[in-house]
Amino acid sequence: MPRKGPAPKRPLVQDPVYGSPLVTQLINKVLVDGKKSTAERIVYGALEGARAKSGGDPVAALKKAMDNVKPSLEVRSRRVGGATYQVPVEVKPGRSTALALRWLVGYSKARREKTMTERLQNEILDASNGLGAAVKRREDTHKMAESNKAFAHYRW
């Protein structure tokens, strides 16, 4: 534990094209090996493709997808007297956003389309319609928390 206390949160810079901090976070999550311009090209291409397919605002589609993927509950392991219990806990807002972005990008990479731009675009559109692997991951997480509700009194 650092003696100075927690490091201060740095403000997120809004991206230049859409002016949205959420798009900046998505770009940073897609980023591999420090190639920011490549990550920007992928994300902006995916958002433009989403605009062409859905005909609406791509940032609104991304926000809707995020709302459909963000978990509100998760399970954490807690060891009590030699037994390990999966204890359901609420997810803080910052963590839920981070998890949703991680799942969106992770399941985009696992898709079968040819380019990462297409994969990300289709995963965002699927998630905004309540479909896709990222939404299924959220449902599985909530189901796990629901089935372990009996251990909620071990919460810390």
Curated annotation (Swiss-Prot):
Domain of life: Bacteria
Biological role: One of the primary rRNA binding proteins, it binds directly to 16S rRNA where it nucleates assembly of the head domain of the 30S subunit. Is located at the subunit interface close to the decoding center, probably blocks exit of the E-site tRNA.
Keywords: Ribonucleoprotein, Ribosomal protein, RNA-binding, rRNA-binding, tRNA-binding
Family classification: Belongs to the universal ribosomal protein uS7 family.
PROSITE patterns hit by this protein: RIBOSOMAL_S7 (PS00052)
Classification via HAMAP family: Ribosomal_uS7_B
Gene Ontology BP, a term: translation
An example Gene Ontology molecular-function term: structural constituent of ribosome
Naturally occurring in which organism (per UniProt): Pseudarthrobacter chlorophenolicus (strain ATCC 700700 / DSM 12829 / CIP 107037 / JCM 12360 / KCTC 9906 / NCIMB 13794 / A6)
Name listed for the protein in its UniProt record: Small ribosomal subunit protein uS7
SUPFAM superfamilies according to UniProt: Ribosomal protein S7
Secretion signal span: none
Ranges that cross the membrane: none
InterPro entries recorded: Ribosomal_uS7, Ribosomal_uS7_bac/org-type, Ribosomal_uS7_CS, Ribosomal_uS7_dom, Ribosomal_uS7_dom_sf
Assembly, per entry: Part of the 30S ribosomal subunit. Contacts proteins S9 and S11.
GO CC annotation: small ribosomal subunit
